[in-house]
């Protein structure tokens, strides 16, 4: 894919790249960086989603008496916070390794966030809306028919998004 010509303004100024460290997500990030080029107004939002629905509601209780192995809500929140902090560290480490010396030059245009959401699709869609993103670039994966070829997350984002979604492999 040819790079955008220097000095030509980019149509998309607020790009969202959901990142899960996969090869497809890495390709999506590199494409976003190429599309942004040297446009000083372009922002690349990089997010990773931690699922907040890791336990069924019947196992979470303020009294600790529901479910087979109940966990109180405070412990559940602590667990989610710990998972999000670990995911955030891993995201930053992964980006530093992936971008290397280029990270310093583009860091001012990156917005990096780890978000808790019921599902990756919900997290990506709500982030895009909250931050008024105008393009989502994400990896695609899977096997089978259309839904399988795109992967369940990219398929869900394509179906739920009101903005353009570009999937890459």
Where are the predicted features?
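Glycine-rich, Arg-bearing micro-motifs that act as flexible, cationic patches
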Residues: 135-156
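Structural beta-alpha unit
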Residues: 2-10, 51, 93-135
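Small/aliphatic-rich secondary-structure junction motif
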Residues: 7-76
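Short, flexible loop segments at boundaries between secondary-structure elements
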Residues: 160-169
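General small-molecule cofactor/ligand-binding pocket signal
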Residues: 45-47, 111-115, 166
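Short glycine/proline- and acidic residue-enriched helix-loop micro-motifs
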Residues: 71-83, 110
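Short secondary-structure boundary segments
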Residues: 48, 139-141, 169
């Amino acid at each position: 894919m040819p790079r955008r010509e220097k000095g030509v303004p980019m149509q998309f100024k607020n790009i969202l790249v959901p990142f899960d460290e996969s090869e497809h997500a890495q390709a999506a990030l590199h494409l976003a960086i190429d599309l942004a080029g040297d446009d000083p107004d372009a922002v690349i939002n990089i997010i990773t989603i931690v699922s907040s629905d890791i336990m069924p509601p019947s196992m979470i209780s303020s009294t600790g008496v529901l479910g087979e192995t109940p966990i109180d809500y405070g412990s559940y929140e602590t667990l989610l916070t710990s998972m999000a902090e670990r995911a955030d560290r891993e995201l930053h480490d992964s980006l530093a390794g992936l971008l290397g010396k280029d990270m310093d030059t583009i860091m001012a245009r990156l917005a990096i966030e780890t978000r808790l959401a019921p599902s990756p699709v919900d997290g990506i869609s709500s982030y895009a809306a909250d931050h008024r993103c105008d393009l989502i670039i994400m990896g695609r994966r899977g096997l089978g028919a259309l839904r399988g070829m795109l992967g369940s997350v990219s398929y869900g984002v394509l179906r739920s998004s009101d903005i353009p979604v570009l999937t890459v492999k």
